[in-house]
Amino acid sequence: MRHLRTEAILGGKRCTLHIEDNAKVLLLQPVDGHDREELEQQIKYIEEHTKVPFIHVAIHISKWNDELTPWPAPPVFGKIPFGEGAHDTLLYIREQLLAELYAQFCLTENDVTVFLGGYSLAGLFSLWVAYQPLSPFDGIVAASPSAWYTGWLAYAESHIPQVTHAYLSLGDKEEKTKTKIMSTISKDILQQEELLKQRNINCKMEWNEGNHFQDNGIRTAKGFIWLINNAL
């Protein structure tokens, strides 16, 4: 690997960074424990498919069902409901994390292109961020995003995207689930793709083999590679 891995506390949150010199791209990704296990494979995959120097920042999320969702919703698994912490997470990225990264690596907004990506609920967070004013991102990756989330598609239909590039993906067996709300995910992701294209967003939709609980890292890596190749 050409990247150096390091751990840091940035703006009060623990982050895992993969760094190389002369970076032209910042890749930001909220992660859980499983995502962190796949980081090495993910970074290696991106390295193998682009020569563009980049820095990847994995933001450790401790309350997965709260910090990534924009409004409350009933629980799907177990008894923990979804919260509305996405606003605070975006504020942290925009006002603290990016400022510390620019200072640490002697960068300015004009030096690098910033992409946001994530898997599952982090993919939903990326989609939601794509619709927020003053978004600091040039493109987003929503890999197997939770587009089934209560109220999401109505929100996407009634708001204007603020990014110019978006990558979506889904496993071809993800709709085969006993969880009713998630069984519509194939239809939901295609509706999301159509909504973005109606707004003239450069949108890529990719189908992967398998269900939801596999290949998180590679699936997310594919999205970042597409952005690097199409949005710089």
What are these regions (language model features)?
Residues 148-219, 225-227:
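The feature captures the conserved acid-bearing segment of alpha/beta-hydrolase catalytic domains
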Residues 21-107:
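Serine-hydrolase catalytic machinery in alpha/beta-hydrolase-like enzymes
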Residues 113-118, 143:
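Short beta-strand immediately N-terminal to the catalytic nucleophile in serine-hydrolase-like folds
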Residues 117-122, 126:
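Gly/Ala-rich beta-loop-alpha elbow adjacent to hydrolase catalytic centers
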